[in-house]
Amino acid sequence: MAIQTSNLGYPRIGLQREWKKTLEAFWSNKIDEEQFLTTMKEIRLQHVKVQQEKGIELIPIGDFTYYDHVLDTAYMLGFIPSRFSEFTSYLDVYFAMARGSKDHVASEMTKWFNTNYHYIVPEYEEGLQISLKDNRPLRLYEEAKQELGVDGKPVILGPYTFLKLAKGYTQEQFPTILKQLVAPYVQLLSELHAAGAPAIQVDEPIFASLTKKEVQQAKEIYEAIRKEVPNATLLLQTYFDSVEENYEEIITFPVSGIGLDFIHGKEGNLNAISKYGFPADKTLAVGCIDGRNIWRADLDEVLELFTTLQKQVQTKDIIVQPSCSLLHTPIDKTEETHLSTELFDALAFANQKLEELVLIHSALTQGTESISNELETYRNVHHTIRSSAARNREDVKAARTALKEEDFSRPLPFEKRYELQQVALELPLLPTTTIGSFPQTTEVRQTRKEWRNGVISNEQYEQFIEKETEKWIRYQEEIGLDVLVHGEFERTDMVEYFGERLAGFSFTKNGWVQSYGSRCVKPPVIYGDVAFINGMTIKETVYAQSLTEKVVKGMLTGPVTILNWSFVRNDIPRKEVSYQIALALRHEIELLESSGIRVIQVDEPALREGMPLKEKDWDAYITWAVQSFLLATSSVANETQIHTHMCYSNFEDIVDAIRALDADVISIETSRSHGEFIDTLKHTTYEKGIGLGVYDIHSPRVPSKDEMYKIVEQSLEVCDPKYFWINPDCGLKTRRTEEVIPALEHMVQAAKDARSLLKTNA
């Protein structure tokens, strides 16, 4: 039995975010297309080289992208919306689909399963000619072979997952379109096989949550493909959960090997193997290193997994690999020497995870004595962090133990609260507001950098923040918004800002991961017990309120989003970490309220993305996620209005959860999903305050008043005007001032027109 190391995907962004910088330079016309392509090639090949040097045998090729791998697949198969037909060059079409243009809205963007990565949603249109427009994986495979002598493993998104992620067709059309994908996939795989690809990784993460009928449908497609490409080595790759429910059928698929996630789907996959075994003529690819977190592996536990598998599986070959692509982890921890020794030692970023794969390979092929020193080191590291004071705070345990049922609910029901709030706040019908942040200009970022580097004093920095806050309070007053925000100029990131002010968090210097397009985030590390220290938002919010007679919202990030957008300790349940965060935020909310802030927004944009992939596991997650929000927000007076915000979600799955949050007002992304949530509300009622975003802030285009009015009009068909709010989709941090002001002016005008119409019809 042969044992090989493999990787499923490598972070794209570059050690110093070279990828991001190159993209943004190209978009702003600072470099031309030739320079863009040259630099991207250098970055791409460097990533292959790193994996080669680390000792990975099956190196992924084609996981690199200029924006998003799902968008790559859509372009490759000809899923190009007709509204982009005026664009002729590849890059013009590609980036118009991703980002929109002056005259055309971008394709929708949404979360990649339950991660914090976003993909561009493929669009199907009637009359679409599906064909292999561009065999990009082949070009990149040949490039790595010619330039580096690397006989890599091409990575492609599988046909079933691709079409399931796409939109624009009816369920009745799905089988027909799926069959139309066979020919381009046959051509793609045939050409890769003919070029000598030793193995081809076909990603099908959707397989973790399919029905029996869907699995049979997928199998028929793979049989049709295999019939035409009988000799290619196809590795069917699943991840993010187990395939337990359909394992018996999946192992009969006509593929050469199957990749299973033994981190996030360990129990289910082991149960399935125990029950049904594994085909002796197939390769088992074992996802044994966590591709979604940053902690060192427990090597003893991993080796125990292989011992269990080797007792139950008499397979042809074994592949040792991460649980999923390393896209979700930072690249290398070597620059994080500012961290405490106990924390630094416990970390493993992408490059360290590759080293762990090689260690496991050595243990499996040469015996555990070959890595005895490393095993001892790992055991000591795990013991040190488990027993650290940061993970064993008595005050945090006491606060958790003292919680009572009444800590999780508001005193009065929504209708009675809202009446009191209307009297207290004196807002008009269809009140307007924004989601929280305003443009972080070059000046804002540069001033923050100077402050952090000690170039300017605390006093100078605070004066600058106050100046920006006052400027935008005046802008908001002039625009005519009803509920204002302070703008969040002091915040780099909506999670990092709070993590820096709570116990139990730590921060990397270079722990960047891709969120969407060129947007990278640096998730905090929750390594210890979370606890409140001092007020986090009081000063800036109270200052903003002192500048205006209008209502100013306090702005906080919710406990579940802080959890889901952080790298979280893995020694206690996520629910317990979420409750710790909620208790700390509860203290902050009480301080805001006692300081005179009457509207407090607690954002939960990541609540949906944390849901397990399998429907059977949803209730348990939703229960503690909702309880976390209620724990944070339920101690305020009835007159204090609690807002929340969500974005990029399949909300039809969680309408009941949204209702259970008991927020007085929720704002939801609507425009980029082309009105899907409006359709959801046609089939269910939502009887609390709600604002459906009227324009997409992720595109640089400024929408017209009429576009926004149309969304308001559609929204009022399904929402009670008494409870309806008007707002953008998300915060405006990434937009430019010259885009934001006219867009908000159009939004306020659309609100005025809608009010006038409602009064006329009253």
Swiss-Prot record:
Gene Ontology molecular-function annotations: 5-methyltetrahydropteroyltriglutamate-homocysteine S-methyltransferase activity; zinc ion binding
The residues that the entry says bind L-homocysteine are I435, G436, S437, E488, D603
Q: Which reaction does it catalyse?
A: 5-methyltetrahydropteroyltri-L-glutamate + L-homocysteine = tetrahydropteroyltri-L-glutamate + L-methionine
Which residues does UniProt mark as catalytic? H698 (proton donor)
> Cofactor comment in the record?
Binds 1 zinc ion per subunit.
GO BP terms: namely: methionine biosynthetic process; methylation
Binding sites annotated in the UniProt record for 5-methyltetrahydropteroyltri-L-glutamate: R17, E18, W19, K20, K111, R519, C520, W565, E609
- Is the keyword Repeat in the record? yes
Its needed co-factors are: Zn(2+)
- Reported EC number(s) for this entry are 2.1.1.14
Q: EC top class, in one word?
A: transferase
Q: Where does Zn(2+) bind?
A: H645, C647, E669, C730
Could you list this entry's UniProt keywords, alphabetically sorted.
Amino-acid biosynthesis, Metal-binding, Methionine biosynthesis, Methyltransferase, Repeat, Transferase, Zinc
Instruction: Give residues annotated as binding L-methionine.
Output: I435, G436, S437, E488, D603
The record's family statement is: Belongs to the vitamin-B12 independent methionine synthase family.
Q: What does the record give as the function of this protein?
A: Catalyzes the transfer of a methyl group from 5-methyltetrahydrofolate to homocysteine resulting in methionine formation.
What name does the UniProt record give this protein? 5-methyltetrahydropteroyltriglutamate--homocysteine methyltransferase
Q: Which organism is it from?
A: Bacillus cereus (strain ATCC 14579 / DSM 31 / CCUG 7414 / JCM 2152 / NBRC 15305 / NCIMB 9373 / NCTC 2599 / NRRL B-3711)
